[in-house]
A protein has these predicted regions:
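Active-site groove signature of glycoside hydrolases
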Residues: 101-118, 139, 144-151
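Basic- and aromatic-lined ligand-binding clefts that recognize polyanionic substrates
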Residues: 139-172
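Charged helix-capping and loop-helix junction motifs
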Residues: 48-54, 84-92, 121-129, 158-163, ...
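Surface-exposed cleft-lining segments at the edges of enzyme active sites
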Residues: 80-82, 111-122, 149-157, 217-220
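Active-site-proximal loop/turn and secondary-structure-junction residues that shape catalytic pockets
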Residues: 9-11, 36-38, 74-77, 110-114, ...
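N-terminal pre-domain/capping segments
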Residues: 1-104, 137, 174, 178, ...
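Histidine-acidic metal/acid-base catalytic patches
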Residues: 1-4, 14-28, 159-181, 185-299
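Conserved beta-strand positions in the central sheet of alpha/beta enzyme cores
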Residues: 33, 70, 107, 144, ...
Length: 299
């Protein structure tokens, strides 16, 4: 299994995803998950006016000798209470970019809305996903949907477990829809990673690996929290998982948004970039140790 991490690890340090690719490479990762969240938030990258951006990424990937192997569509507010055509088109832009970069799959979150039933949620999400799924077929890119984190509001339903994921995929009934298993989100539910993965079987084409204490979606590295890595690894072996081991553990250092602010000086509001890259190197070593322990590490 090959180790991957996301460009979003460096979202606090750059609005330029090409720079983020360099930082990830400098930390030791060869395989990279391209986060369109950086582009969308800053109106850079594929959402900018730069007509040469796609080629610039291709050139940088070739120069650094890295591989873009997975992607994540922007995490919009995803509240289905208005016109969603713009969200659909913005996501299809990601699909087109993935095709040009040779990325085989992109993760697209399901949406939600207050005070609607599970059945209505499924219907609205199918309406949202179908044109994206068809674009994926056209461009040769698989669409992955993931289990979301534990819902804390009684008036909102969203898909946060394997059983509901299976039910949703059967409801959408499209051959280009697959699953990304988010292990950190599952840990919030106190569920068995192995049992949940076994329910999904060969529908699982991707992973998000991160940890937490079971009470908040912290997105910390493995061993920072309470997740059972053994249960996860046993589950991956049980389903014959052949994909990448992809980190989404950007909070090696707590995000600056959660840190108390000193009005007089903010030089250490976030860790210096050089230190953050060193921490990213530790993330690589953590992943390498996990995979070597289970005799499945691939360079």
């Amino acid at each position: 299994m090959k180790l991957v991490t996301t460009t979003n690890d460096f979202a606090a340090y750059t609005s330029n995803s090409i720079e983020a690719i360099e930082y990830v490479k400098n930390a030791g990762f060869k395989y990279i998950d391209y986060s369109f969240c950086i582009d969308y938030k800053n109106k850079t990258g594929i959402y900018s006016a730069d007509e040469d951006y796609i080629e610039k990424v291709i050139d940088k990937v070739r120069e650094l000798d890295v591989c873009l192997v997975q992607a994540h569509a922007p995490f919009y507010s995803f509240i289905f209470d208005g016109d969603i055509s713009g969200l659909i088109e913005d996501t299809i832009k990601c699909v087109r970019a993935c095709a040009k970069w040779g990325i085989p799959s992109v993760v697209v979150h399901a949406g939600y809305q207050r005070n609607i039933s599970k059945e209505e949620n499924f219907r609205k999400n199918k309406e949202f996903l179908l044109p994206i799924l068809e674009a994926g077929v056209q461009y040769g890119v698989k669409i992955l949907t993931e289990n979301f984190n534990k819902m804390e509001f009684d008036d909102i339903y969203w898909i946060d477990n394997a059983t509901d994921l299976m039910e949703f995929i059967e409801f959408v009934n499209h051959p280009n829809l697959y699953v990304l298993w988010d292990a950190g989100h599952a840990n919030l539910q106190e569920m068995s990673q192995e049992e949940e993965l076994t329910k999904l079987g060969d529908l699982v084409l991707g992973l998000h690996i991160h940890d937490n204490y079971g009470d908040f979606d912290n997105h910390m590295p493995p061993f920072w929290g309470t997740m059972s890595m053994d249960s996860l690894m046993q589950g991956l072996f049980a389903i014959g998982y052949k994909g990448y081991f992809t980190f989404e553990s950007e909070n090696i250092f707590l995000s600056q948004e959660h840190r108390r602010i000193n009005a007089n000086d903010s030089r250490l509001l976030k860790a210096p970039l050089e230190l953050r890259i060193k921490a990213e190197s530790l993330l690589y070593e953590i992943g390498k140790t996990i995979l070597k322990t289970y005799d499945c590490f691939e360079e």
